Amino acid sequence: MAEEGQVIGVHTVDAWNEHLQKGIDDKKLIVVDFTASWCGPCKFIASFYAELAKKMPTVTFLKVDVDELKSVATDWAVEAMPTFMFLKEGKIVDKVVGAKKDELQQTIAKHISSTSTA
């Protein structure tokens, strides 16, 4: 497992399921960056996404390469990159499509404030 404050690269379906289950068990907000190695905007926002992970250690930040995990991208209906999915207790609570720094940060903040701490 990665340390808090890091973006966790998910490379297998088993790892994906494990992280989802951990998020459900811990009642943590999970933000998933669906990305691709050939996607320019994905590269543009990657360092910003990593900065957010450092600033918000209570949130789990995952990164999924859609070419590496096609089945996961298909299951979650990802049609454009980057797509950021916000999950709580295994359900999608929000989504940001595109390299939109402000919208990404605001959406995370909105869902952190609505998460009750145990």
UniProtKB/Swiss-Prot annotation:
Participates in various redox reactions through the reversible oxidation of the active center dithiol to a disulfide. The H form is known to activate a number of cytosolic enzymes. Belongs to the thioredoxin family. Plant H-type subfamily. The active site is at C39 (nucleophile), C42 (nucleophile). Disulfide bonds join C39-C42. The record marks D33 as: Deprotonates C-terminal active site Cys. It comes from the Eukaryota. It is found in: Cytoplasm. SUPFAM superfamilies: Thioredoxin-like. This is Thioredoxin H-type 2. It comes from Nicotiana tabacum (Common tobacco). Residues 2-113 form the Thioredoxin domain. Its main location: cytoplasm. GO terms for cellular component: cytoplasm. The record marks G40, P41 as: Contributes to redox potential value.
